[in-house]
Amino acid sequence: MRVKIEDVCDKATSNLKQSDVMNKKGLFPVFGAAGYLGKIDTFHQSKPYVAIVKDGAGIGRTMLLPAKSSVIGTMQYLLPKDNILPAYLYYVIKARHLEKYFSGATIPHIYFKDYKNEQFDLVNFEKQKQIVHKLKVIEKIMTNLNDELKLFDELIKARFVEMFGTLSDNENGFDVVIIDDVCSLIKDGTHQTPQY
């Protein structure tokens, strides 16, 4: 069944500032646009929810956050209604690319009123669970592949040093030159199709 975002969640705001979290030693986590910030003695949300960055850099980025936690004021709570799993709502919101609704040049913002009418297919709870499970598996595979790429990058750098050494030790006795010695700067090419 096609529904709107506003049919499956309520919005709420936070009055917490990042300074409210600094140097506190509470029990309940607080999150900001970049993730975990710290812990305080109270929480705003008793159930799992979705948070979206609504102000500043990273607008539209979403997080699925646990019960008994809070976010700071640059984020907005999207509180799932009884007809949707929090994780399913998270993937729906993430797939909508809500950053397209931004306004403001200096500090971009997005507002619930602008994206609340986005439509998607709401399936039954069993199907939601299946979809969430598949998407989590895909995300895990993507994370593993990205980790593997980082390791390959480190391997390439290490092999390069093994083959050519470093500038400081230059154990192979290579000539040390500046880029101007071995490259030509081409400022402007031909403005016609070359003839071969």
Briefly describe each language-model feature range:
Residues 86, 101-107, 123-131:
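Short, flexible active-site-proximal loops enriched in glycine and acidic residues
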Residues 138-152:
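Amphipathic alpha-helical coiled-coil segments
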Residues 32-94, 103-106, 111-115:
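A short beta-sheet element
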Residues 1-16, 20-32, 119-132, 148-190:
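Non-catalytic DNA-recognition/assembly elements of restriction-modification systems
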Residues 194-195:
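Charged, alpha-helix-forming regions
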